[in-house]
């Protein structure tokens, strides 16, 4: 499939809709994000782009981390560590202003899927 056909297939859709359509036709997570970046000419926030810092709740010497940011004026927060809805290594908890509550114990890929809904 050439890029013009892909643009026609995905044209006028939100980033999340594009992602879901690409997954539905068999693209991998990373390939879907790369295609969306090419079509929209936007650099999407990937998990590796998150800047984790010590979480303010580090009162008991157990490592807790958090990252936060904004996309198009919409905020997101990702946390991990003891008692924070993820181990901070493989699983994390994410909250965005579009969600009604935090989503705990999700993978790095799932964090990216939630964050792209802010575009």
Predicted region positions:
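Mixed-charge, Lys/Arg-enriched low-complexity segments
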Residues: 41, 95-119
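Intrinsically disordered, low-complexity regulatory segments enriched in Ser/Thr/Pro
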Residues: 77-106
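Hydrophobic beta-strand residues in large extracellular and virion-surface proteins
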Residues: 32, 69, 76-78, 92-94, ...
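Basic helix-extension-helix modules of the SAP/HeH family
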Residues: 12-14
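Short Gly/charged-rich anion-binding patches and loops
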Residues: 17
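Negatively charged, low-complexity tracts enriched in Asp/Glu with abundant Ser/Thr
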Residues: 5-10, 23-72
